[in-house]
A protein has these predicted regions:
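Conserved donor NDP-sugar-binding/catalytic core segment of glycosyltransferases
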Residues: 48-80
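Active-site-adjacent helix/loop segment of glycosyltransferases
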Residues: 151-192
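Acidic donor-binding segment of Leloir-type glycosyltransferases
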Residues: 1-14
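A short, conserved alpha-helix in the catalytic core of glycosyltransferases
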Residues: 108-110, 114-119, 124-151
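A recurrent flexible, glycine/aromatic-enriched loop bordering the glycosyltransferase active site
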Residues: 74-76, 91-110, 126, 132
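Short aromatic/hydrophobic "clamp" motif used to bind/position activated sugar donors
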Residues: 36
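Glycine-rich, basic loop-to-helix element that forms the pyrophosphate-binding segment
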Residues: 15-31
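The conserved acidic donor/metal-binding loop of glycosyltransferases
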Residues: 40-44
């Protein structure tokens, strides 16, 4: 990490293991650009990922684009869970509209000033921080655009135990989102 930080345009942040959301917030606060992109450790962005996000960042008409989200492709392995998960995610992205309600954590870019104005990433959220900031951006009058050509490749998700553990974590996060952001208070109640 320190080696990457030696580049003129790169800053390396070293901190205690205090969580993904806290790490994202630290990076957001130190960032200087108009747009800030985020990804996850278990994905590999395609070489043109940032370019594709930027190509989709222009507002059309009276839109106020505050975030652009790409497409996550789950790699397949011989494991049944991996095959099911990759098909499930592929199906989800196939029917996703251009204006969407979620800037996915592994593959999104945010207008820095807008993200800071809504409070950025809450370090107390252990999971679903992407969902929370998405709802806040939409509530502030922004939109999130889906850019299907901005691709990141996710490592295969294998093993039933790991799969169930992650889905349990997702369920807890969804409950927390619904509790803190009930559908009656959201501009677009659906999650896609």
């Amino acid at each position: 990490v320190h080696k990457w930080g030696e580049h003129d345009l790169v800053s390396a942040i070293v901190q205690e293991p205090i969580g993904l959301s806290a790490g994202r917030m630290a990076a957001l606060q130190l960032s200087k650009g108009e747009w800030v992109a985020i990804t996850d450790i278990d994905v590999r962005p395609e070489p043109n990922w940032i370019e594709e996000l930027l190509n989709s960042s222009q507002s059309q008409g009276d839109e106020n684009v505050m975030a652009v989200t790409g497409r996550t492709v789950f790699a397949k392995s011989s494991d049944t869970v991996s095959l099911i998960r990759s098909v499930e995610i592929e199906s989800k992205y196939r029917s996703r509209p251009r204006i969407t309600s979620l800037a996915n954590g592994p593959c999104s870019m945010f207008k820095r000033e807008c993200l800071l104005n809504v409070g950025g990433f809450n370090p107390e959220w252990y999971h679903a921080e992407d969902m929370e900031v998405s709802l806040k951006l939409i509530a502030s009058g922004g939109i999130i655009v889906y850019s299907p050509d901005a691709v990141v490749n996710h490592v295969p998700e294998t093993g039933i135990g790991r799969f169930l553990s992650k889905r349990s974590r997702d369920a807890r996060a969804h409950v927390r989102i619904v509790r803190n952001y009930p559908s009656k208070n959201r501009k677009r109640p659906g999650f896609d």
